[in-house]
Amino acid sequence: MPIQLGLQRMLQLLKHLGNPQESFCAVQIAGTNGKGSICSYIYTSLLQAAIKTGRYTSPHFLEPRDTISINGQIASEEIFNTCWKQVIEVDRRFRTKATEFELLTATAFQCFHHSGVRVAVIETGMGGRLDATNVFEEPVLSIISRICLDHQAFLGNTLEAIAKEKAGIFKKNVPCVVDGLNEVNVLNQLKLSAEETRAHPFYLAKGKSGENKNEWIINTPNWGTNTFSTPLKGDYQGQNLACAVTALDILSSSFSIMLPHVQNGVKNTSWPGRLDIRSVPSLGDILFDGAHNKEAAIELAKFVNSQRREHNKSVSWVVAFTNTKDVTGIMKILLRKGDTVIATNFSSVSGMPWIKSMEPEVIKNSISSESSVECYTADNLTISEILRLAKEKNSSVIVCGSLYLLGDMYRYLKLDV
């Protein structure tokens, strides 16, 4: 079933399940970029505070089950299968005709309920107002990350329209944290939405770089100014971290969360597929990044170009895209003279048959105007052959364009997530 935004099916499904979402406290996170990192910072910090915590993120990386984590582990096959069967049975019995994403989301809530989770960190799937995750009457906190143009067919063609949709997670008397470096028109819309919903207090989160690499200085209402060190790479992590730390500071008024819990949690955070450098046998280091829109490409380019200056290397880009992406715009940001592009596709996505991979030839044609780069298609090559070809062309290899492509790569290469 294709994407069908709306809450009626989801609310009916949850009602017939006994409303499992009412059994835990929810931290809701919406936005275009950075949601997953923010989720992970909060999740690992809550675990450091010995709070039984769940996390729900999407899309899945290797399999649908990995969208659901409980107390530091991906949901076990036993609990996932049990809860999935319960959800499917209820959906069939009451003919709610829920979408795949709604079924998976309900399964996550059912897993959290049966596991006795106290706090669940919930990433919005798309948008906010009509997303299947937006079923909490009174979450403990709402967070909005960086907002950019993406999914315009569903959310609107302007940043203001998209911001309004994402602000649909705001609830009366529930505090909200917003990435303070969003564009002014976005911040104005979010403030207006918060006022209309009577969501308050309204916090703008901002971080600044510290003395050392991957070190950030963040000021929060209760803890004041502190320094945090993260293993996650990229300048944009400063803002993701600022949102997470501000959120945790606010949560500390209701839960036993101390500053050292957060500092240790941040140090131990991992998030696969985002500036993720992995050592692959016989191929050496490969950088995997899920950048699939222009803003994410800009951040990836910043990181890659800093490495280019240091090592004076051209890059081999292994890319695949869903069939609605602006390949020309994204690759124009990434490519430099002497680079190589190998266009491929990703396999069918479990539970999401409407997600289609762009044909490699279409990708090639979209960037053929970049005459200073070589471009190949890899229709009939295995993943090993694709990566070997990329390595032969340039010692620096980057895989990007789609998390679904990264999922294929991680499965094939048996990389940990």
Swiss-Prot record:
Q: Give the pathway.
A: Cofactor biosynthesis; tetrahydrofolylpolyglutamate biosynthesis
As recorded in UniProt, its EC number(s) are 6.3.2.12
Q: Where does ATP bind?
A: G34, K35, G36, S37, R274, D289
Q: Record's Gene Ontology CC terms?
A: cytoplasm; cytosol; mitochondrion
State any single GO MF term. dihydrofolate synthase activity
Report residues binding Mg(2+) 2: H151
Q: What keywords would UniProt list here?
A: ATP-binding, Ligase, Magnesium, Metal-binding, Nucleotide-binding, One-carbon metabolism
* Keyword Ion transport included in the entry's annotation: no
Q: Which reaction does it catalyse?
A: 7,8-dihydropteroate + L-glutamate + ATP = 7,8-dihydrofolate + ADP + phosphate + H(+)
A GO biological process this protein is involved in?
glutamate metabolic process
Which residues does the record give as Mg(2+) 1 binding sites?
A: S58, E123
Q: Which residues form a coiled coil?
A: none
| Role played | Glutamate-adding enzyme which catalyzes the binding of the first glutamyl side chain to dihydropteroate. Leads to the de nove synthesis of tetrahydrofolate. de novo.
Member of which family? Belongs to the folylpolyglutamate synthase family.
Protein's name in the database: Probable dihydrofolate synthetase
* Organism of origin: Schizosaccharomyces pombe (strain 972 / ATCC 24843) (Fission yeast)
